[in-house]
């Protein structure tokens, strides 16, 4: 068992059929909603931002997703940026954007100095 109250954020990994399974699981969607309502970090990549849309978490927020899932970002202002951070929600487009997605999560919790240190150790020069 997991004590979700001890966690600072939640990440939905995307992919298919994983995204469909996440969205259909009442326990997952309940936790995602609870994290959002508590102001905790909610992240999703690839097709998984569609789950956030279905949960009502993207209302009034800017978000991105894998090409072809834009219509599932219910309530969001759709962006085609690789990574979008809007308040406590971070979304990203897919596997090719995963390093930037990870660095956005590090940035949310840490300093820019920490982000640069992680970037350096990843040998990621972007």
Give the predicted meaning of each segment.
Residues 2-126:
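Active-site-adjacent pocket-lining segments in enzyme domains
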């Amino acid at each position: 068992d997991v004590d979700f109250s001890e966690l600072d954020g939640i990440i939905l990994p995307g992919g298919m059929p994983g995204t469909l399974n996440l969205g259909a699981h009442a326990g997952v969607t309940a936790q995602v909603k609870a994290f959002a309502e508590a102001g905790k970090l909610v992240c999703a990549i690839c097709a998984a931002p569609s789950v956030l849309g279905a949960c009502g978490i993207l209302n009034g927020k800017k978000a991105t997703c894998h090409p072809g899932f834009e219509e599932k970002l219910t309530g969001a202002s759709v962006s085609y940026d690789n990574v979008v951070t809007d308040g406590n929600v971070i979304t990203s487009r897919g596997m090719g954007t995963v390093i930037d997605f990870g660095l956005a999560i590090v940035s949310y919790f840490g300093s820019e100095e920490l982000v640069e240190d992680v970037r350096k150790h990843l040998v990621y020069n972007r």
